[in-house]
Structures are given as structure tokens and as C-alpha cells.
């Protein structure tokens, strides 16, 4: 009997202090560019980034900001709207974005700028292909890039 009462008293604080989880469903109704999300990352500022089949989406907890490929304005942007993967750089304020057939984009969210890395058949140091499937941070500060090649 003592063991039963002791077990109840030991478990009771855990049961009483439990907080209910709140789950917020995010979709195109809330501003997401597409319901087909292929990758999610959280940056150092707490924003959530969603890679979709129709652009890059930043969610600040209240609203979405969508980044699309800009072909007509000349504005700096991502190189493609069909995305495969995201990685928040463990050191710098950079979000690495792997695309389908459009290389890698490095988005610096500290100064709102993009750098693009593409395959160049004349440069053996470039990406082997523009189809990027996964980006992984190595412990030595380098990146592992997975491709369809």
C-alpha cells in the first residue's frame, strides 16, 4: 500500500503541471504559397522557413512572406520556385536553399541578399548538377551537397 501511495504522490506533480500543446495548421489559407511542403528550417531569429513546389516561405509566427523567382523585375531573388531542401547555416545568418534544376541559393537573412551557385560545364569546381536534393552541414564548417547526379 505504501508503494502505491508513494507512486501516486511522485507522479501527481507531473500530471498537474502538464500544459496542453497548441498546434497551428498552416496552409494556403494562411498565406503559404503551396500546401506541398518539402522542407522546413528554423533560423537563428526564430522564423520558420518552408520550401514548397511554388517558392520559399518565411513565417514569423503571424504572417508569411513568400520569395519567388523574379524574371522580369531584375530584382535579386531565388533561382527557381521548385525547391527541394533547406538548411540554416549553423554559424552564419545564411539559409541554404536547394532547388530542382536551379542550383543552390544562399540567402543571407541579416542583409536580405541572395548568392547563387550553379553548375557550369566550363568550371570543374562548380556543382556537378543543378538538381540539389539535400544540404548537410559538416562539423568542419563545410557543406555536403546531395544531388540527383
Predicted segment positions?
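Carboxylate-rich, polar loop motifs that coordinate divalent cations or form catalytic acidic clusters
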Residues: 1-149
Amino acid at each position: 500500500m505504501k508503494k502505491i501511495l508513494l507512486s501516486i504522490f511522485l507522479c501527481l506533480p507531473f500530471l498537474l503541471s502538464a500544459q496542453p500543446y497548441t498546434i497551428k495548421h498552416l496552409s494556403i489559407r494562411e498565406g503559404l504559397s503551396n500546401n506541398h511542403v518539402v522542407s522546413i528550417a528554423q533560423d537563428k531569429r526564430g522564423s520558420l522557413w518552408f520550401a514548397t513546389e511554388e517558392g520559399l516561405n518565411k513565417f514569423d509566427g503571424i504572417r508569411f512572406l513568400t520569395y519567388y523567382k523574379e524574371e522580369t523585375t531584375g530584382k535579386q531573388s531565388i533561382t527557381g520556385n521548385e525547391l527541394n531542401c533547406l538548411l540554416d547555416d549553423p554559424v552564419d545568418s545564411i539559409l541554404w536553399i536547394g532547388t530542382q534544376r536551379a542550383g543552390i541559393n544562399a540567402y543571407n537573412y541579416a542583409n536580405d541578399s541572395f548568392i547563387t551557385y550553379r553548375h557550369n560545364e566550363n568550371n570543374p569546381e562548380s556543382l556537378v548538377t543543378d538538381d540539389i536534393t539535400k544540404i548537410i552541414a559538416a562539423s568542419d564548417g563545410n557543406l555536403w551537397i546531395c544531388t540527383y547526379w
